[in-house]
Amino acid sequence: MKVLVIEDQTMVRELLALACKQALPKAGVRTAGTRADALALCREAPPELVILDLVLPDGDGLDLVPELFALAPSAKIIALSSHIDEFTLHRALSSRVHGILDKNEQPVRILREAITAVLDGQQYVSSLVQRLKASVRANPAAFDKILSDREQGVLRLIGEGLTNDQIATRLKISASTAKNHRLNIMAKLDMHSTPQLIRYAIEKGFTRIPEGPPRS
């Protein structure tokens, strides 16, 4: 079996690779620290199992999932992050990944459990992620129940501080349509200003605040 670990932190990457070797002693395990390196390795030899960190120095891990499936259609993908928020959970569940893990839960142990589960055809969601999932499901005001996919995309850009004109350019829509989306989002969330929307976008995980220099 070919396994690819995609993780930018060197120590964590080595620990995850070790966990894969322990769970699958006969597997060939390769590692990548960036999105670009991961895609290059996938083109050389499509993996059957991918361990994917969702925060990479050269791109969003979940944005990488469709490209991984294009290069390795039958691969099992286990996503992991130390920042599982509502929007990340929603995107991960919609992306067809086979496992979602929170790094704050003894990642080596739960990774071994996840590998066993996904290779057996199951979906694996770690306990902290399960709790968040249950909380979102029980909340009638959860964003995925009241905002359309397009509105979620617009909110993500609002969280980045983009104007209506900039959103229109990014999404290839008219500025008036972008404005209408903004107003509809405000109405649905019962908010009355762009700063409120930006705070909400950050709180729910639509937008991330940079955490300083790249990790080694």
Model-identified regions with their sequence ranges:
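Active-site residues of response regulator receiver
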Residues: D53-L54, S81
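Short amphipathic alpha-helix used as the core "switch/output" element in two-component signaling
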Residues: L62-S74, H90
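Recognition helix of helix-turn-helix DNA-binding domains
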Residues: G161-Q196, E203
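The feature encodes the CheY-like receiver
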Residues: P57
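Acidic, metal-coordinating helix/loop segments flanking the phosphotransfer/catalytic sites
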Residues: T31-L49
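Short, flexible helix-to-coil linker/hinge segments that flank and couple to helix-turn-helix
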Residues: L89-K145, D149, G153, F206
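Conserved acidic carboxylate
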Residues: E7-Q9
